């Protein structure tokens, strides 16, 4: 307490003359007005307000003027420091601004009138405002709106808060203690008249105020003290003229009289120190957060700063204050003065993309020339320099541009993190990208043994929101082509997807509804990748079908991920299933199968001939690609085998000759064929095999490469450009890079096609779709139910729905596998794999609200969790042997949805993005109406549940027990119709009211 001193004061009259509303008593009992003062919690600033709504700030112990701005039309009544600025309360508004004066939010509301005081409630964004008789108003400064109004006895004139409670004093001398939700905990009668000041520190409240007198009011000679933990009064502090009271963090109390007498009371040592400030009449006192500075203002317009620790900061951890950069004056320069470069002229402020910011795909910027080696032995003869050429590097060689400073790039943020960052900055942030200048591969980088990161194995990271929170666009270089989630067979699927003959054949087969399930799944995947328009897709349905084939379960672990074996098995299995329909089998064989004639000749003269179909040809050994291909088409070998004619082992000559080649030729490269794997180059993409091909030339569609120490990638020609596909990473590459020899890249498969330039058929097959699945029950075998004994809950449609028909949809799911997590050494929980959900029920309603599809899906796998509370599915409902529900297979239900999608129907539902992702179906945005997005205000950063919207908008309670997809889809349909019935302005008012009601009940439906 020793050493309190007053540095030089400043006159407030230079800036404003102040007069305010909260009363303070003089020695003779008169009332004057107080000045709102406060210290900044984060920087060395002092804030003051005036009667004209002006707020001013002063920097440091010299009280240097820092900023000045208008907070409102009325007088300033309260100031609260914020970590991102200042919150000022005027009589008619609440103003939230930066320290420099830029407005963040300006809140006006009919409930905000005659405002006198405010303080924090929940965190630094929610404030409670007092001054209106009988009520307190809660305002959110970040959202800029009134969240709720709370009834309160009397009119609050003073407020203070702590971490656990809010304290306010009324005009009749009552002190009210409430929790952070403003629920009244206790009320004390502190004074007979109004309050003069209220101070809260930890669990101690001190107040000073007025008593009634014959001439009006006189100052109360006692400072009242209360313990908030025990909710009882403590011994008061006697001080005859206490107008202001402030508590420091180190158990000291500053008491100030109107005449400027300052008393410091140390509660630990009971020492009292008195000081006298040279003032006219004190109308404001405020202590700094550390307790080593305080400011005093008086009615003459003076502001004094006192300190017992000079040259120290006001706050505990003070941040540097930003000052404007001093303007520099430059001498005028003529535009014709060639001594000054044009780059010396600064750029004005701009918000649009500059023309000079061209992407590297448009123009390839070269590197500046290398500097001349200083070691050259230069000799000058007649002013001409000469040096020997040691031929260490090529002359006049242009180098591709490479940014040496960028060595790596951060992993992508989760989508939820990006939304939080956008909200925190209150502006759009630039989307990150995996691709940079260093990803332009040069001959030097490609010849290095280090694998470039474009070719490395990628990994999906999972947040608490699952895989939907992963930013896949980070890995797609604005190509408009869809990648696939991690799967070892993705390169082959991508290769066939961009082979137009295969694509068209698969889509036509799906449209006709062929019984070949593998081929159907391939076609559905291709259609989904086309509709995705660059968004990532999943091959989970195809792989689930593939894994269900008995032969795949006996594969060795190393063969289970072999892409060549997968290709051979996939095509052979499709061909085997196609044999049930000879016409379809012939078409498939002509498309992908090579007819091979095998002739076995024994030394005894016995001869046998057989015809077979090969869907992949393995290149034989050879020095060139053409030599390898010729040996592949005609193979001969000698061995010994058992002869049934001679009944003994004989020498056998085997001749294999490719009699006819398919339209699409699939070639594989054996592991030992290193020369072909590393050095085959067919730059023009055409090759004419030595077989009966009617002189048609094959064109290279693409090829698959094994990356050393990583997985496989695909190089595919799309139009006239080459693209690299590495799971969900898709980027354009040059033809030179695609065919470049590298020590870490080995070709394993390639696809050639006759008519590779054939147009992709995206729409014409829709005219020949088999839509019978929409009109037939198609229950699974063993499901002993019928319409005579069971209420199916729906009626099948009788005719094909026209385009743009509204279909309300809701889907329910069950868990087949729980998520896999890992607890790290630091205690953090990391999701290794999300839970595996499977479609269990899907319901669709027509525009009138009548169900026409209500499919329960038969599941033969083990179900870990039925999620009954959310799905309404009970154990046994999906078992065909015991279920009393109408069960259909997953392919049947999926086909019904796919048919409605391609018929142009529009789906209405709530949370459809998650439903369609789990179903694994890509639906164009123009065919989706999601009530989650319709009833959403982005600035609120909260999406509303179906149950709450039904209660608040429709006035009905849903999901009271277990969820029911029929009820949920019908509720979503009603919400959409409500949206259609409202005019745009009317709907905005409705939506604001929905959020207002939600904040009052915490967005939960009241139970009563």
Curated annotation (Swiss-Prot):
Enzyme nomenclature, EC number: 3.1.13.4
Keyword Hydrolase: yes
GO molecular function: metal ion binding; nucleic acid binding; poly(A)-specific ribonuclease activity
Keyword Metal-binding in record: yes
Class of enzymatic activity (EC top level): hydrolase
Domain Exonuclease: 808-976
Repeat region (WD), residues: 29-68, 110-149, 158-198, 200-236, 277-316
GO annotation, cellular component aspect: P-body; PAN complex
Cofactor(s), by name: a divalent metal cation
Record text on cofactor binding: Binds 2 metal cations per subunit in the catalytic exonuclease domain.
Catalytic reaction list: Exonucleolytic cleavage of poly(A) to 5'-AMP
Annotated residues for binding of a divalent metal cation: 810, 812, 915, 968
Domain USP span(s) in chain numbering: 450-755
InterPro entries: Exonuclease_RNaseT/DNA_pol3, Haem_d1_sf, PAN2, PAN2-PAN3_catalytic_subunit, PAN2_N, PAN2_UCH_dom, Papain-like_cys_pep_sf, RNaseH-like_sf
Regulation of this protein's activity per its record: Positively regulated by the regulatory subunit PAN3.
Subcellular compartments: Cytoplasm
Biological processes per GO annotation: mRNA processing; nuclear-transcribed mRNA poly(A) tail shortening
Region feature (Linker): 314-449
Alphabetical UniProt keywords: Cytoplasm, Exonuclease, Hydrolase, Metal-binding, mRNA processing, Nuclease, Repeat, WD repeat
Subunit structure: Forms a heterotrimer with an asymmetric homodimer of the regulatory subunit PAN3 to form the poly(A)-nuclease (PAN) deadenylation complex.
Function: Catalytic subunit of the poly(A)-nuclease (PAN) deadenylation complex, one of two cytoplasmic mRNA deadenylases involved in mRNA turnover. PAN specifically shortens poly(A) tails of RNA and the activity is stimulated by poly(A)-binding protein PAB1. PAN deadenylation is followed by rapid degradation of the shortened mRNA tails by the CCR4-NOT complex. Deadenylated mRNAs are then degraded by two alternative mechanisms, namely exosome-mediated 3'-5' exonucleolytic degradation, or deadenylation-dependent mRNA decaping and subsequent 5'-3' exonucleolytic degradation by XRN1.
Annotated domain remarks: Contains a pseudo-UCH domain. This ubiquitin C-terminal hydrolase (UCH)-like or ubiquitin specific protease (USP)-like domain is predicted to be catalytically inactive because it lacks the active site catalytic triad characteristic of thiol proteases, with residues at the equivalent structural positions that are incompatible with catalysis, and it cannot bind ubiquitin. It functions as a structural scaffold for intra- and intermolecular interactions in the complex.
Family: Belongs to the peptidase C19 family. PAN2 subfamily.
Protein name stated in the entry: PAN2-PAN3 deadenylation complex catalytic subunit PAN2
Native species: Yarrowia lipolytica (strain CLIB 122 / E 150) (Yeast)
Gene that produces this protein: PAN2
């Amino acid at each position: 307490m020793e050493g309190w001193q007053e540095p030089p004061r400043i006159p407030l009259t230079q800036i404003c003359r102040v007069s305010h509303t909260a009363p303070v008593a003089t020695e003779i009992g008169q009332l004057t007005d107080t000045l709102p003062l406060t210290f900044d919690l984060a920087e060395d600033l002092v804030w003051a307000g005036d009667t004209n709504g002006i707020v001013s700030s002063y920097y440091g112990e010299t009280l240097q003027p820092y900023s000045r701005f208008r907070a409102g039309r009325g007088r300033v009544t309260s100031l609260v420091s914020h970590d991102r600025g200042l919150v000022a309360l005027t009589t008619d508004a609440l103003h939230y601004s930066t320290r420099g004066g830029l407005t963040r939010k300006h809140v006006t509301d009919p409930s905000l009138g005659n405002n006198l005081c405010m303080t924090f409630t929940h965190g630094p964004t929610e404030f409670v405002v007092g001054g209106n008789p009988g009520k307190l108003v809660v305002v959110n400064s970040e959202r800029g709106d009134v969240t709720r109004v709370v009834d309160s006895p009397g009119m609050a004139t003073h407020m203070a808060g702590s971490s656990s409670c809010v304290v306010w004093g009324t005009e009749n001398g009552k002190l009210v203690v409430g929790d952070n939700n403003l629920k009244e905990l206790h009320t004390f009668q502190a004074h007979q008249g109004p309050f003069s000041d209220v101070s809260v520190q930890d669990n101690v409240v001190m107040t000073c105020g007025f008593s009634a007198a014959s001439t009006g009011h006189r100052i109360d000679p006692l400072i009242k003290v209360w313990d908030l933990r025990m909710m009882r009064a403590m011994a008061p502090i006697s001080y005859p003229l206490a107008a202001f009271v402030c508590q420091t963090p180190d158990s000291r109390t500053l008491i100030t009289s109107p005449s400027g007498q300052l008393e410091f009371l140390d509660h630990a040592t009971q020492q009292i120190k008195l000081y006298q400030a040279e003032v006219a009449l004190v109308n404001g006192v405020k202590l700094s957060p550390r307790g080593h500075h305080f400011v005093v203002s008086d009615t003459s317009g003076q502001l004094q700063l006192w300190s017992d620790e000079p040259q120290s900061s006001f706050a505990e951890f003070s941040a540097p204050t930003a000052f404007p950069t001093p303007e520099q004056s430059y001498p005028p320069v003529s535009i014709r003065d060639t001594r000054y470069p044009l780059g010396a002229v600064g750029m004005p402020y701009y918000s649009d993309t500059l023309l000079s910011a061209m992407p590297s795909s448009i123009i390839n910027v070269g590197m500046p020339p290398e500097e001349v080696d200083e070691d050259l032995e230069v000799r000058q003869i007649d002013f001409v320099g000469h040096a020997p050429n040691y031929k260490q590097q090529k002359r006049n060689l242009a180098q591709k541009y490479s940014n040496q400073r960028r060595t790596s790039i951060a992993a992508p943020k989760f989508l939820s993190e990006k939304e939080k960052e956008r909200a925190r900055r209150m502006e759009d942030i630039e989307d990150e990208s995996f691709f940079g200048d260093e990803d332009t591969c040069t001959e030097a980088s490609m010849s290095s043994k280090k694998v470039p990161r474009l070719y490395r194995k990628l990994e999906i990271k999972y947040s608490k929101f699952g895989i939907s929170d992963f930013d896949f666009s980070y890995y797609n270089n604005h190509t408009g082509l869809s990648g696939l989630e991690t799967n070892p067979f993705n390169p082959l699927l991508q290769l066939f997807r961009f082979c137009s003959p295969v694509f068209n054949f698969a889509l036509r087969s799906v449209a006709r509804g062929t019984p070949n399930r593998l081929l159907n799944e391939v076609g559905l995947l291709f259609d989904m990748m086309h509709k995705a328009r660059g968004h990532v897709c999943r091959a989970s349905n195809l792989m689930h079908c593939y894994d269900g084939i008995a032969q795949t379960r006996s594969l060795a672990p190393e063969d289970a991920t072999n892409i060549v074996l997968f290709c051979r098995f996939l095509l052979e299995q499709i061909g085997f299933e196609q044999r049930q329909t000879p016409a379809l089998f012939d078409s498939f064989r002509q498309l992908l199968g090579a007819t091979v004639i095998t002739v076995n000749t024994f030394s005894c003269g016995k001869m046998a001939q057989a015809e077979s179909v090969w869907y992949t040809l393995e290149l034989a050994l050879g020095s060139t690609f053409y030599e390898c291909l010729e040996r592949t088409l005609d193979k001969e070998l000698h061995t010994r085998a058992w002869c049934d004619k001679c009944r003994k082992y004989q020498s056998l000559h085997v001749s294999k000759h490719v009699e006819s080649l398919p339209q699409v030729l699939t070639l594989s490269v054996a592991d030992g064929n290193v020369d072909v794997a590393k050095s085959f180059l067919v730059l023009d993409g055409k090759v004419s095999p030595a077989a009966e091909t009617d002189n048609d030339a094959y064109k290279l569609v693409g090829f698959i490469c094994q990356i050393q120490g990583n997985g496989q990638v695909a190089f595919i020609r799309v139009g006239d450009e080459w693209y690299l596909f590495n799971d969900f990473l898709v980027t354009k590459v040059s033809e030179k890079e695609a065919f470049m020899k590298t020590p870490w890249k080995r070709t394993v498969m390639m696809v050639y096609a006759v008519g590779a330039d054939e147009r992709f058929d995206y729409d014409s097959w829709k005219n020949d779709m088999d839509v019978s699945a929409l009109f037939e029950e198609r229950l699974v075998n063993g499901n002993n139910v019928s319409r005579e004994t069971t209420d199916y809950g729906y009626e099948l449609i009788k005719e094909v729905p026209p385009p743009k028909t509204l279909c309300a949809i809701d889907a329910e799911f069950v868990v087949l596998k729980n998520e896999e997590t890992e607890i790290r050494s630091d205690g953090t929980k990391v999701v290794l794999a999300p839970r595996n959900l499977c479609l269990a029920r899907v319901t669709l309603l027509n525009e009138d609200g009548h169900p026409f599809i209500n499919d329960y899906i038969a599941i033969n796998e083990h179900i870990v969790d039925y999620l009954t509370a959310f799905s309404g599915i009970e154990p046994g409902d999906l078992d065909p042997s015991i279920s009393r529900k109408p069960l259909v297979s997953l392919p049947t239900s999926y086909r019904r949805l796919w048919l409605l999608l391609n018929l142009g129907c529009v789906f209405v539902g709530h949370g459809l993005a998650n439903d369609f992702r789990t179903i694994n179906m890509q639906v164009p945005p123009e065919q989706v109406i999601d009530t989650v997005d319709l009833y959403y205000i982005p600035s609120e950063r909260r999406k509303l549940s179906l149950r709450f919207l039904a209660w608040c908008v429709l006035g009905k309670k849903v999901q009271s027990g277990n969820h029911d997809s029929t009820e949920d889809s019908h509720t979503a349909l009603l919400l959409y119709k409500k949206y259609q019935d409202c005019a745009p302005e009317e709907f905005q008012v409705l939506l604001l009211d929905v959020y207002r009601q939600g904040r009052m009940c915490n967005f939960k439906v009241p139970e009563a």
